[in-house]
């Protein structure tokens, strides 16, 4: 497995032609995209929806398998993580949080982005992960194995 992290470079990598060129030329092996939802930022429904929207835009640019992670889960309360996981499982729960927690333009913008994401048909099932306690990485590895090796092991 080769994972390339582009911290702080999403605009450069995802929205310019060079990003797609790098992805295509990096290796002849199977490829995918890991999109990371920053757990501390995404406990707010506006930021969660904005990340869904960005992940959707990246997916339409690369057309590669895409995996979604919620990072820094060790820094979230159990209730905060449960709420984000509920949002990913049930769009109506996210809509209810938008209505309850957002007002004005932020509410309208979130509702419109949710509608667009729904029309695109993106599925969001983020894995909670933490580099501090290694939570979720075995699940990510399993998902990658299912996609790229039909459940077999990776080989060099």
Task: Indicate where each model-derived feature is located.
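Acidic/glycine-enriched edge-of-secondary-structure segments
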Residues: 6-10, 97
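Inter-motif core of Ras-like GTPase G domains
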Residues: 1, 6, 15-42, 54-68
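Canonical P-loop GTPase G-domain recognition
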Residues: 55-65, 73-156
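Conserved ATPase-coupling elements of RecA-like P-loop NTPase cores
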Residues: 11-17, 44-47, 79-80
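Residues immediately C-terminal
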Residues: 9, 42, 75
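Gly/Ser/Thr-rich helix-start
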Residues: 9, 69, 135
